Amino acid sequence: FNGPLTTDLINIGYNLWFPVMFFILYWQAFTFKNPCLRLKFFYSFILCWIINGVLLATIFSSVGPCFYERAGFLPLDAYSELMARLNAFTESRPIWALSTQDSLWRNYLNSETGLGSGISAMPSMHVSIAFLMMLLGFSQENKFLKVFLCLFFILILIGSVHLAWHYAVDGYLSI
């Protein structure tokens, strides 16, 4: 996973999280094939945000590796090799995670609040929702959808660590 091509693929895949999530939400909002499953999905989706995104994020307030050095944690160079490698890759192609991380850190320093402006690492909502979407995929007859959502979950789990958003344990707790 150390090469620029792999990082590019992970970067693109990780940034597809919002479109995939919105597609799944839209699909579930307008499908009437299995109303019981649909209701379970939406209840689970809401509970993921309440339990993981509010309750556990407050209890386990933390910052990911991308903010580790900026926040002044010791040793200061614990994740500098990872960040240096990601920054070296971005010289030839943009890694969107890095510019987003810079923007989030500026928001934090300026005490700006708003939707999507937090830097909490544990638990990972990307991993939590990707896992929920994978479970939904397992309930479908469409094999492509099952495989896609399973691979997408794995990509998000790996990408959250590879792109320095999260520690591995953040993703495990999210599940």
Residue ranges and their predicted role:
Residues F18, F41, S61, H126, ...:
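Divalent metal-coordination and catalytic microenvironments
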Residues F22, Y26-F60, C66-A78, L82-M83:
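Interfacial segments of alpha-helical transmembrane regions
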Residues W49-L55, L151-H162:
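Aromatic-anchored segments of alpha-helical transmembrane domains
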Residues S62-E69, A121, L155-I175:
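Interfacial helix-loop-helix junctions of multi-pass membrane proteins
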Residues N34-R38, E141-L151:
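Membrane-helix interface segments
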Residues F23-F30, V127-L145, I175:
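Membrane-interfacial alpha-helical segments at the cytosolic side of multi-pass membrane proteins
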Residues F1-F23, T31, F60:
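N-terminal transmembrane-helix/juxtamembrane module of multi-pass inner/ER membrane proteins
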Residues I59-S139:
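Membrane-interfacial catalytic/cofactor-binding modules of polytopic membrane enzymes
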